Structure formats: C-alpha cells, structure tokens
Amino acid sequence: MYNRDRAKASSGNSDIDRILSEISQDCLGLRLRKLDRIVTQIYEKRLAPHDISLAQFTLLTVIGRLKEPSPAQLGSFLQIEKSSLSRNLQLLIRRGLVAAPDTRAQRIDRVGLSEAGRRKIQSALADWRAAQKAASDLLGPRFFRELRKAVDTLDAAPR
C-alpha cells in the first residue's frame, strides 16, 4: 500500500518539493525558532550550574526591572503565553526567588524579586555574561545590533 501511494503521489512531487524547499529555506518563523533554540542552548549550558533556566533567569530579571509587576504586565512585556508564565512563576515562588503577597490566593496580583532572587541573578551574572558574549560572537556584533533593533521595532508595532 505504501509503495502504491508513493508512486501515485510522485507525479505531484515536484510541486510539493518546491513548496517544502521554499518553506524550509525561506520561512522566517522556522529560522527564528531554530535561532532561538540554538541561542537558548548556549545560555542554558552556562546557567545550568546555577540551577536556573534561561526562561526563569529572564523572568527574574524582568520582575526586578519592572518593580512588582502584575502577571499580565510580565506576559505583555515578554510576549509569553499565560500557561508558560504561570508555570515558571509558580516554580520561582516555590523556590523562594520571587515573592508574592499571598501565594494561597487563587490569583496572584503582583510579584516581586525576593532577596534570594537578587542573589541568584548576581551569582549567575558572570555565566550569563559569558553566554551573552558567546552568542554575540557567533552572530557577530552587527547582526546582534540589528536583531535588537528589529525586536524593538516589532515590539512597538501594532498587532
């Protein structure tokens, strides 16, 4: 059955092959996802000794930077889906890295960086900087600058 289906489909293969080639080579979404995974691996390797993921480190940083943001503000700033944000926030709260006024409440209104969270950022800083340099060196300084500009432009654009 498989061979018969393959033979039957082979007549249209050139069209689908061109389509698949176009998408796999030119799709910005595919390329950005791949870039994200590669760069994330660089950071994850450096942050591993600190028992924190890049997503968690980033979340801690943004919480500290925004000074007691609401989960909605965090989600908007990071462009992260609600379930991922909630999962990581709960983990950071359980680990004592993030403070929430009342963790027994159904809904968390505001979160803040705890003293342990500040120490975690400080202890991981040298390795974060090493990851930052490694990623920047791989991409090149010009690409890195252009990427920052592109993200800022897209972030400010209406959706």
Give a label for each model feature.
Residues 35, 39-42, 78, 120, ...:
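Alpha-helical linker/hinge and terminal dimerization helices associated
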Residues 20-23, 30-33, 37-84, 95, ...:
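N-terminal helix-turn-helix DNA-binding core of bacterial DNA-binding proteins
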